[in-house]
Regions:
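N-terminal cap/lid segment of alpha/beta-hydrolase-fold proteins
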Residues: 1-21
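Active-site glycine-rich loops that stabilize anionic/oxyanionic intermediates
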Residues: 26, 34-37
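Conserved alpha/beta-hydrolase
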Residues: 39-41, 46-71
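Alpha/beta-hydrolase active-site loop
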Residues: 76-95
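Alpha/beta-hydrolase-fold enzymes
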Residues: 106-194
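Short beta-strand/loop motif that positions the catalytic acidic residue
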Residues: 211, 217-219
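Short alpha-helix in the alpha/beta-hydrolase fold that links the catalytic acid
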Residues: 213, 227-237
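Catalytic active-site module of serine/aspartate enzymes centered on a nucleophile-bearing elbow/loop
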Residues: 247-291
C-alpha cells in the first residue's frame, strides 16, 4: 500500500475540497461519508480498500474535520454545492491522477445519497456506485418511536435555522454541526422522499430512474437508520435497473451490524465489494472522463 497523501482540490467556486489520496492499481474508490461524520472515521476502510491494491480518494465533507468551512449564518451550502461542484472537481482530479482507472463512488449514509444523485446527473463520469448503510429518512419508512423522532427533527430543523443560522446537530445528538442548506434538503427528503438540488426536486429522481450502470447496496442487518424499508425507499428510485442489495450480519462483521460499527471492522464490507466487482467485471464500460 502506498503512503496516503493529503490534497486540496479547487472546485472552481472558491472552495478547496480536502481529499486523502492513496494511489494503487485497479479501480479507484471515491469515498463520501455520513451526515456529521468527519473523514478520519473512515481511515480503517481506506486502509482495507488500499490493501486490495485499489486507489482511494476519501473526500472530507464541507464543515467537518479538515474543511476550511464551518456552518454559520454567513457560511451556508446545500446538497447542490456538493453534488454539482465538489464531487465533479474531485472526479476531474482523479481522471488526471489515475488515468484510465475505473472509478466507483462509495457512499455511507448521506454519502450514499450523494452517490445516487451523481448517478442521476452524470453517470458517464464513473463506472458505478456503492451505497453502504444508506436509507431514506422519509418519515413513511419508519414506525412508531423512530417515526416520531424523524417528525420531531423535521419540526426542529427550521427552528434551529432561525435561532442559530445553522443546525447544531453536535448538541442535539443527530448529525454534526451542519449548514442550514444541507439540513433543509435533508428535511425535504424526510418529508417527500425526493432529492432536491436548489428549488428542483424532480430532475435528479427523473434522471436516476433511467440509470443502468453497476450499483450495489450494502445493508446492515440491525441498522435502525437504514432498515429494509428505508433502504427500499432509496432503491425504488432506480426504475430501469434496481441495484443489487446485500445484507451483512453481525456474525459476518464480527461486530454489531448497525449504522456505524461496520466501519470499525470493514473487512467484511470490502470482501463483499471485491466479490461484486469480480462478478460485474471491473472497468468493462468506457468512461467519458474528458466530458
Amino acid at each position: 500500500m502506498s503512503e496516503a497523501q493529503w490534497v486540496r482540490i479547487d472546485n472552481g467556486k472558491g472552495y478547496s475540497v480536502p481529499v486523502t489520496w492513496v494511489s494503487g492499481g485497479g479501480p479507484v474508490f471515491l469515498v463520501m461519508g455520513a451526515l456529521g461524520v468527519a473523514a478520519p472515521f473512515y481511515d480503517k476502510l481506506v486502509a482495507e480498500l488500499a490493501a486490495q491494491g485499489w486507489s482511494v480518494a476519501l473526500m472530507e465533507q464541507r464543515g467537518l474535520g479538515s474543511s476550511a468551512l464551518r456552518p454559520s449564518r454567513r457560511h451556508n451550502w446545500s446538497f447542490r454545492d456538493v453534488v454539482e461542484d465538489d464531487v465533479p472537481a474531485v472526479l476531474d482530479w482523479i481522471a488526471r491522477e489515475a488515468t484510465r482507472q475505473p472509478v466507483y463512488l462509495f457512499g455511507h449514509s448521506l454519502g450514499g445519497h450523494y452517490a445516487a444523485m451523481c448517478a442521476g446527473l452524470y453517470p458517464q463520469r464513473f463506472e458505478g456506485i456503492v451505497m453502504c448503510a444508506c436509507g431514506s429518512p422519509w418519515i413513511t419508512a419508519y414506525q412508531e418511536a423512530d417515526r416520531r423522532r424523524v417528525q420531531r427533527l423535521t419540526r426542529l430543523i427550521p427552528l434551529c435555522h432561525l435561532l442559530f443560522g445553522y443546525y447544531p446537530g453536535d448538541r442535539l445528538g443527530f448529525g454534526g454541526r451542519e449548514a442550514r442548506g444541507v439540513m433543509s434538503d435533508w428535511r425535504h427528503l424526510a418529508l417527500t422522499n425526493r432529492y432536491r438540488l436548489g428549488a428542483d426536486d424532480r430532475r435528479v429522481d427523473q434522471s436516476l430512474a433511467d440509470y443502468t450502470g453497476p450499483a450495489l447496496m450494502l445493508r446492515m442487518e440491525n441498522d435502525p437508520f437504514a432498515s429494509a424499508i428505508a433502504v427500499d425507499s432509496v432503491l425504488r428510485r432506480f426504475q430501469r435497473h434496481r441495484p443489487e442489495e446485500q445484507v451483512l450480519s453481525a456474525g459476518e462483521l464480527n461486530d454489531k451490524a448497525d449504522h456505524f460499527r461496520w466501519a470499525r471492522r470493514p473487512a467484511a464490507v470490502v470482501a463483499r465489494l471485491a466479490r461484486w466487482l469480480e462478478e460485474e467485471g471491473v472497468g468493462r464500460r468506457t468512461l467519458d472522463v474528458e466530458r
